[in-house]
Design a protein with these regions (language model features):
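Active-site-adjacent helix/loop patches that line small-molecule binding or acyl-intermediate pockets
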Residues: 100, 111-217, 240-244, 248-249
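Active-site Gly/Thr loop motif
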Residues: 218-220, 268-321
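Bacterial N-terminal signal peptides
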Residues: 6-17
Length: 327
């Protein structure tokens, strides 16, 4: 969303090295007044943390700090973190084959194809499976709006046909990092039930044990599919401060309050580029890897992006995290 991006860029200018020793609180005041005046009317909260400490926090709705914010597709990044927690415990691998966790569905695939047996967890983490699934294409078989019309979202995903590559569309071999990217909510949505089968726990319980409790997140609220699986493609509700904690966790290399919550190896792997999402944006394991130009200087970010401008930006070079939430 344009408004969230503009606020981010305005605040980011404060965090450049030149301003490291002289924080300009007046700029935060200006941002607050701009939102209140209706210039960015959909924004509900902004939080800025630097060096692990919150230096600016403001809420523009009645809910305030305690309100749960619908993270939209930023939920996907949480799903990637939970995959990492399972990998850290030896219960899952990025190379694990998706259909291996759903043997009960092999015999009833709508479009059976031997190549589906080779689709991996990593393919879903990087939005680059061979399934024909593109939320940005309204006629795509795998568009998420079609998924929401049926009861079984995992079967919907596994039933999708194989994606075609006409001569004007780059193949994986012709694409950066050897992967052809397309935004597909169905993939991360399927990772939820897959994680449950791998760890043998309901996903909300696993998330509470390995991620939320260690970070002091006490009030996470999941959305659920028609078959009562936690929805890992979107809809998780967290407070603004909880979103900051998730960004700070990765900025800290997986550590929180002196404890290694997620392995540093998984954090590095998640934040490495695995596919190219846009001409100027790479994609990790459900993280957006984007460099902005602020005041003529490149500023690298790792992003949790949700529809409507709900975003968490991690700025590794500035040791900072910015959270923007919207209606």
């Amino acid at each position: 969303m344009r408004s969230a991006c503009l606020v981010f860029m305005a605040i980011l200018a404060l965090l450049l090295p030149a301003a490291a020793h002289a924080q300009d609180d007046g700029a935060f005041t200006a941002a607050t007044e701009a939102v209140k005046a209706g210039q960015y009317q959909q924004i509900t909260s902004i939080l800025v943390a630097r060096h692990g400490r919150v230096i600016y926090e403001h809420y523009f709705d009645a809910g305030g700090a305690a309100a749960l914010r619908n993270t939209r597709s930023a939920t996907k990044t949480v799903t990637g973190i939970l995959v990492g927690a399972a990998v850290d415990r030896g219960l899952l691998r990025p190379e694990s084959r998706v259909l291996g966790y759903f043997p009960d569905r092999r015999a009833r695939l709508l479009y059976p194809d031997g190549r589906k047996a080779h689709i991996t967890v990593e393919d879903f983490l990087t939005m680059s499976s061979i399934l024909e699934c593109d939320d940005e294409n309204p006629v795509s078989r795998g568009n998420e709006e079609r998924m929401y019309l049926v009861e079984d979202w995992v079967q919907f995903t596994l039933d999708l046909p194989i994606r075609g590559f006409p001569e004007w569309v780059p193949t994986p071999a012709q694409s950066p990092y050897g992967r052809a990217w397309s935004y597909c909510t169905a993939g991360p949505t399927t990772l939820g039930p897959l994680i449950q089968r791998a760890v043998k726990l309901p996903l909300p319980d696993f998330a509470q044990t390995v991620l939320f409790r260690p970070l002091g997140i006490t009030d996470a609220k999941w959305a659920f599919t028609p078959l009562h699986d936690a929805m890992t493609g979107g809809g998780l509700q967290l407070t603004t401060r909880d979103l900051w904690k998730l960004g700070q966790l990765y900025l800290n290399g997986g550590r929180w309050d002196g404890r290694q919550v997620i392995s540093a190896a998984w954090v590095r792997r998640s934040l490495s580029p695995h596919a190219n999402a846009r001409p100027d944006i790479d994609y990790g394991y459900l993280w957006w890897l984007q460099t902005f130009e602020i005041a003529g200087k490149p500023v690298k970010t790792w992003g949790m992006y949700g529809t409507g401008g709900n975003k968490v930006y991690v700025l590794p070079d500035q040791d900072a995290v910015i959270v923007v939430t919207t209606w």
